[in-house]
Amino acid sequence: MKIVVDENMPYVEPLFGDLGEIIPVNGRTLTPEQVQDADVLLVRSVTRVNAALLEANQKLKFVGSATIGTDHVDLAYLATRGIVFSNAPGCNATAVGEFAFIAMLELAARFNSPLRGKVVGIVGAGNTGSATAKCLEAFGIKVLLNDPIKEAEGDPRDFVSLETLLQEADIISLHVPITRTGEHKTLHLFDEARLMSLKANIWLINCCRGDVIDNQALIKVKQQRDDLKLVLDVWEGEPNPMPELVPFAEFATPHIAGYSLEGKARGTFMLYQKLCELLAIPATKGLSDLLPRFNIKAVELEQLPDEKALLQLARFVYDLRDDDAVFRNCFAKENGFDIMRKNHKHRREFSALALAYRGQSEVDWLSNLGFSGVGR
């Protein structure tokens, strides 16, 4: 069995090595010739999977995408061919939620404007939006959710209209899929008019898809509104973001919000489980077998952390400032965006860091944030 796999997908060899011949490829430049003999194709969001790519292949059984979204895959075409498809919904949700939360802590520190007391509006209450809300609510932050699709489906959570969210939120975090047509179109959901209407001193964080915000309009608005603070992990025109926009972002990164070691391993592992199910063989490998030990054994707390101390703990796990600095230095270089993604260091999730606390105060909120080992 030939398994063609994006070369940037981690843990493929230990998971799939016993199942067939692994053929690593560049996912962004993948050609029909490279997949014409594949039995299994494993991709990320940079690969367009459609008839043009697969028409020469008559033996493909399974396509797996280690992503939450599926907009890069022609699902209808795969169905007509009888090709089984699986993605990895939620695989990097924790990573994205923690990224957005850390970004808010960093902005709070940079502008001496505490996160506690602010209202955060989350647009899109799926896996990543829910993970962001979980972090915020654990820290005692009021969260407003907007997701008309989930609301219509009967999701029991409380939702508000986008207009209400824009009026009441001090921070907006975007977590919607890209939808180009229809009643709930998200393409340029934040156009020039909507960006100009945002309340004063708003923080806007985009961790979903670059073209949910009209980036050209965002440049124009930022030229007029210095009070609008931006954290951008995604960009229109990836892998070539508009260079004029980068200086306007407080933190800028190359679409790596979901790039935790845990999240990346989880995505590959979910595809391994699905392929084993398709092949009717037992999944003998475990996710816990893949992850290395964290380089900090534990942090002993003499007292529970305030907001500034929490940021220091978060930086033990992930320092957003480092990725921001690398991005500004490299994004304009040839293939810089993709090189940064490929060479992204092994960021961990909060769960990798154990905290030891023996005081009498309530510690559940630290556990709910995801830190491990919290106890009295």
From Swiss-Prot:
One of its GO terms (biological process) is 'de novo' pyridoxal 5'-phosphate biosynthetic process. Substrate binds at residues 45, 67, 259. SUPFAM superfamilies: Formate/glycerate dehydrogenase catalytic domain-like, NAD(P)-binding Rossmann-fold domains. Its EC number is 1.1.1.290. The active site is at 209, 238, 255 (proton donor). NAD(+) binds at residues 147, 233, 258. One of its GO terms (cellular component) is cytosol. InterPro entries: D-isomer_2_OHA_DH_cat_dom, D-isomer_DH_CS, D-isomer_DH_NAD-bd, Erythronate-4-P_DHase, Erythronate-4-P_DHase_dimer, NAD(P)-bd_dom_sf, PdxB_dimer_sf. It is an enzyme of class 1 (oxidoreductase). Pathway: Cofactor biosynthesis; pyridoxine 5'-phosphate biosynthesis; pyridoxine 5'-phosphate from D-erythrose 4-phosphate: step 2/5. Its main location: cytoplasm. GO terms for molecular function: 4-phosphoerythronate dehydrogenase activity; NAD binding; protein dimerization activity. It is found in: Cytoplasm. PROSITE patterns: D_2_HYDROXYACID_DH_3. Keywords: Cytoplasm, NAD, Oxidoreductase, Pyridoxine biosynthesis. It catalyses: 4-phospho-D-erythronate + NAD(+) = (R)-3-hydroxy-2-oxo-4-phosphooxybutanoate + NADH + H(+). Gene3D superfamilies: 3.30.1370.170, NAD(P)-binding Rossmann-like Domain. Belongs to the D-isomer specific 2-hydroxyacid dehydrogenase family. PdxB subfamily. Catalyzes the oxidation of erythronate-4-phosphate to 3-hydroxy-2-oxo-4-phosphonooxybutanoate. Homodimer. This is Erythronate-4-phosphate dehydrogenase. The gene is pdxB.
